[in-house]
Amino acid sequence: IKSRQQKMRGFYSNRRIYIDNKVTCEEMNQVKFYYDTDWNVVSPSDDEGNSIYVYLTAGQDHKITMEAIPGEIGDSMRRLNSIVSDINEYYRRILMITGPAPDKFTDYNVDRSIPELVDDFSEISKELKDIKDNIESLSGEKGSEAAGIERMYVILDKCIEKPSKIPKYLKQIKDNVSAISSWMRDYKDQPLEVDYIEIASSDREFTSTDEKFIKSAAFSAKAFLTSFFQDYSMISEETDDDVLDVWINLGRDQALAIKELVESDFTPEYNIPVNLNIVQGGVVEAALAGKGPDVALFLGGEFPVNLAARGLTEDLYQFEGIEDVLSNCQKNAHVMYEYNGGLYGLPLQQSFPVMFYRKDILSEIGCTDIPETWKGLIDTLPALQRNYMGAGLVLPTSNISPSTEAGHTFALLMLQSGLNYYNYDMTSTTFFIFKAVQAFETWTDFYSKYKFEQTYDAFSRFRDGTYPIVIQDYTFYNKLKAAAPEINGLWDFTMVPGTVRDDGTVSHAANSSGTGAVIFNKVKNKDDAWQFIKWFSSTEIQIGYGNLIEGLLGTMGRYDPANVQALKQLSWSPSEMDKILGQWNELKEIPVMPASYVVTRNIMTAFRTAVNKHENPRDTIMWLNRDINAEITRKRENLGLD
């Protein structure tokens, strides 16, 4: 097996090898692939180094399967997982006493407040030393992973020696726990690259990985010279006159997955040649210069509407079957791609907010009921803040962030009140309505009265427990699963806090963000372009694309399709899917207009003025609303809409 394992320095990955679904001998139960930055040929062998022979019946197909297994270190991993959980619990308990920024001149007496702390740290330190010795004996060398464990017990020993200094070491404890957890995640993945698998008869030797010097040098020189002329943004190169030029506004991994699907499914079935290019940004400029594509995939934000306002894209309502395609999506998913009665983008991705919460921490501080409404969230704050904790909301980081960003608190409050940003004919805002002013005041109160932070790292705060409640995009789940294994099972998610309606029911309405596919009006064959985006947005292809991306990138790269039937077929558990669909059914959308930029700027200006300068929220939003409506009117006249 020509392979390379260059992720876990000082250790090895393990594989169990099956021949026709059977492990043929004990040596195949665990084949080790040691750390090396170079490629090596690994051949399963016995204790004396003799090759393993397998009988294969001639004339038949045979299957080789490689299964990732933990190997001998599995017991150490289980012990480490328990230790990480214990240290995290003590970290939170200490944090409740000292707060996130301990005063170095204050003696917090944490060892008295937590009497068992020093004894337990001593036991944990001993166990970490034992685990480190075990790992080094298995690997045969001192790797970075064992060094990380060593750093952890050195810190614990300092805490044991001088308990009064424990608050000083809080950050180091947190950082080392994160480092150990990260390595545990990598080990669980059992990283391994495989170039090829070679089967040889007993009278032959396996191919060496060493290449002849001249051949290697020639290849390197050729690759170097080619790098000056190669267009790395081009994924495929078709030269037919009727080729469909498609730009992809994503990374190379995603583009290669689309290329695989196009070559294996679309082109053979429809006989339409396709050129794929990676282009991140510059689409509007290229289209205005007449150098744009025929089709662009994964355009998001205000781009589809801005392109439509400039007359650069095709109205998708003209194509046969558009209603059937849209029926696969949430009923309002297309709203953000509509302009002046037309549809200028086909939804591909759709993400929306949910509320994540730490079950362990909320239970520990006596919050047994998960907040269902905004009032419930506010009622939870005293218990959180008494313990130096808080909750996190979605707030754009600058005035140029989309005002309709998924989970934007003002947008949630407006939608849950039965309002939208704009009136029916999109000629002015609704911010002058009493309920809209109430929504704005509620939003600013979170930051002025209840002292929510305007900027924070949601992942770090949720991971270390200082923010046991955060509202984030549902794809935040992927990051927690992949990058915070030490808190697996300690958290969950549910719908965003809601607003009680007049009839007593609760509205959990929220907006979403997404990306779509657009067809440019320079396209030679509109029907071919429509066939392509209809094919790509179909349930079968969206499932295939989602599986390819998750296979390449892992859980962190799990796809968020707008096609709900495709979403249901991805790797979500039934309970997780029920929660996602629960929020999905509550989604409402805020339209995009060419003057959305002025809405964005003035909403955030009003917020900063009311919160940071302590101005009256009502007066602030009413005053700036006049500027918003004046710019909307000017823009509509400029575009000939009025």
What are these regions (language model features)?
Residues R4-N81:
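Beta-strand-rich ligand-recognition modules
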Residues R78-E238, L581-D642:
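Conserved C-terminal helix/tail region of periplasmic/extracytoplasmic solute-binding proteins
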Residues A217-D240, G301-V354, I378-T380, A406, ...:
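Hinge/lid segment of periplasmic solute-binding proteins
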Residues S264-N332, M336, D360-I365, D369-E372, ...:
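Extracytoplasmic "Venus flytrap"/periplasmic binding protein-like
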Residues Y339-L348, P353, K375-T429, K435-A436, ...:
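Extracytoplasmic/periplasmic solute-binding protein
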Residues P382, D425-T455, V496:
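Glycine-centered hinge/linker elements that transmit conformational signals in sensory
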Residues A484-T555, K588, T605:
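Extracytoplasmic/periplasmic substrate-recognition and gating elements
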Residues T494-G498, N547-T605, T609, G640-D642:
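Long, aromatic- and glycine/proline-rich binding clefts that accommodate carbohydrate-like moieties
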